[in-house]
């Protein structure tokens, strides 16, 4: 039988792509990620367990290896546990070889964050053949694989003790590159540990006792970029550890390298505490080329439903503010708990976890479920929050809720792409609507211990009666919507959630997602949405048409056109010449990117005045002082009055630039004399120093 999509493909002589499949590695909007600490999930092959002091039989010592491996994950895909849960992406522990030594306090590298060789596997998880089977099994089940990645550091080390653990040693496929206390090639920073007092301090000093890479070192830069490409042959996504502790400039050059080689969805960890809002966090998410774990979402939902220190007004304010602060809020990765915080179910009733999961799965962003949350696994802080999975019960309420809402995310584009509108709110009740085109999801949450009758509720749902998509797993009722959009005063049961929806695909083009959101001319970009039509139209970057690689009604792949570097709005024009609303702020890069450290000596300033750099390419602000890069640093790698900053700039490019000073009122003082000139390297990194 020939499917309609095959007929269309033949007519256009273009391949078609299926939305929300494993082939779309840059769009996770409709996916549900399941985070696994590999060592703690399932032991599928006891033969690869470690021996001796680093292994804990029956996991009685949570600081040690417990036996979980890739075969265990494969088994749980094959027996249907993960697929029936509705999971479409697995975030696994960093798969690379980690240190074997036992820390003096009894700690081990079971978590995967103490790398020693990024070009080898952790043998306690499996070998490369096992990893290939993990990925192929996942893909056959419609599941993507995301790997953790730690380009910030190797492993624990002390300047004064070369025998401490493994001295931060770094290997290149078995060959020693260097170690921390005998760092002849200057692979690491030697500035002591960070006290987290400033952004600069957190970047250029060690995070705790972890040997901090000097990412401005050409050997380190090349090695890390080579290493991730080895894994990119198989994987579908990357979670980058500790992005707050590396320069944005180097990380942007990394993302440019990845997107040119094999674009995959990438998100980073920038930890925020309860109630913490950091503009630098937003800037990074908007400019670096990668998304972030959404700690504002995670901390707020925990405050509302777990700790009961906030209410739904606070949650709604967070939703509204982050929609403004993040250019791509649907690409931020949301959660209710993870490996760096206490388990959500630690001090709450099971129904509170159920409510939190329902909100997570119907809110904007890419939802991530920490392994065992669906089993109400408890635990305090590390390592208690990393207990082994004991049961794989498919009858828990959380398992059923996740399964139903994961399925709805796949079917209804409002959950993947839609905006959020608050429809009714008080301290205990939150009713919010997600809408994309004609598809709508209305979610009603009552987190109080008493029933609530809702008056004056309005919605975009069409006239009709709607049953709860959760089938009363959380005591949701039906709702009746009138022709004018008013609802007939529904009653919400105590501690309940109801989800009502209509799925109706748009017949005119609507862009829901573009990924990645940075790229140079010729890079492949995927445009997802609805109503594109089966016949090829066009995709515009501003007013310039892009080369079409593939086209379907819900997904288009294009090549970034040859346009001047800068930000562009994208739009889709279908075959009947109907144009979509613009999708804003795609950044066209000037070319391949390299990280360069710019430094200027003798730049004295008054209190409240900072130094910036501006120049002749988009990456340096195109001579616009409002887009100048900075404020620059002056405390760690260089001391005031020398200022410095690591910046991603086009490779092999003749650059012109100047330094400027900005005071707290925005007044600008330009560096005198001719423009500074410099040719960036074709590959690698560099440092260029001039005088004020």
From Swiss-Prot:
Residues 1-20 form the signal peptide. Ca(2+) 2 binds at residues 152, 203, 212, 245. One of its GO terms (molecular function) is metal ion binding. The keyword Disulfide bond applies. Its cofactor is Ca(2+). Ca(2+) 1 binds at residues 43, 45, 48-49, 67, 69. It is an enzyme of class 2 (transferase). GO terms for biological process: carbohydrate metabolic process. GO terms for cellular component: extracellular region. CDD domains: AmyAc_AmyMalt_CGTase_like, IPT_CGTD. Its EC number is 2.4.1.19. Disulfide bonds join 59-66. Binds 2 calcium ions per subunit. It catalyses: Cyclizes part of a (1->4)-alpha-D-glucan chain by formation of a (1->4)-alpha-D-glucosidic bond. The active site is at residues 241, 269. This is Cyclomaltodextrin glucanotransferase. It comes from Brevibacillus brevis (Bacillus brevis). The lineage of its organism: Bacteria, Bacillati, Bacillota, Bacilli, Bacillales. The gene is cgt.
